[in-house]
Amino acid sequence: MAKVRKAPAGDFIKFLGTAGARFVMIEQLRASGGIWIAFAGTNVLVDPGPGSIVRCAASRPRLDPGKLDAIILTHRHLDHANDINVMIEGMTEGGFKKRGVVFCPGDAICDDSVILRHAAALPERIEILEANKRYIVKDFTFETSMRHIHPAETYGLKFSIGGTSVSLISDTKYFLELSSFYKADILILPVVFFEPRPGVDHLCLDDARNIIRQIRPKKAILTHFGMTMLKSKPHIQAQGLTRELGIEVVAASDGMTVGF
């Protein structure tokens, strides 16, 4: 079973931020730096939002962007992609080493690209994410989900890391097929709203409850909190879900590390 650690050591998932929705991000009530995954010497950064480079520098021990092997964007929205260019600079050691891979949906590098032309030339390659495809990053693989229901082209991720499966749901409106794809040992869910918000393509706490109940992972981690979730105290809500579902549910905090 996964365990929470205070600092990275060996193989881990580290939350460089847990902000969801624009006002939590803008006011930095929670950090918005994305998620760093490390396994067997391979390092991947998912969704480097605003302040990702700062959160790497502030981590203890410090996370070195020059050790990254890949950066993945689940979609182009600012809370997920704002720091993509500076993190590409970091991964390539200021552009002096052509290394690393960037994975992103096609609309992230369209005419209104979130990746600057200069930065796009720095990594070894940019791979376009498509629905239900498998990708390899050195020592582990990941799959993309079906396209999510969200204004931007958005895909979630399922990682096979050693003997552990980790699913990361990205922003989406709830739909039934989510539970069939995201079955995993560790399930990470973005819970923007405390209560349903019709017409807005994000998950609420009831959606998270339904998904966790259907998948029954060994551990579920709530993150990407909006204002209503913060006011409702995510750790209290996670404790309630643990009691209700009989599954370990944790509310992520900025800097939290989960070891394998």
Describe each model-derived feature in a short phrase:
Residues 45-49, 68-79, 104-105, 166-172, ...:
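Active-site neighborhood of phospho(di)ester-bond hydrolases with catalytic His/Asp-centered motifs
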Residues 51-101, 184-186:
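Active-site metal-binding motif and surrounding structural segment of the metallo-beta-lactamase
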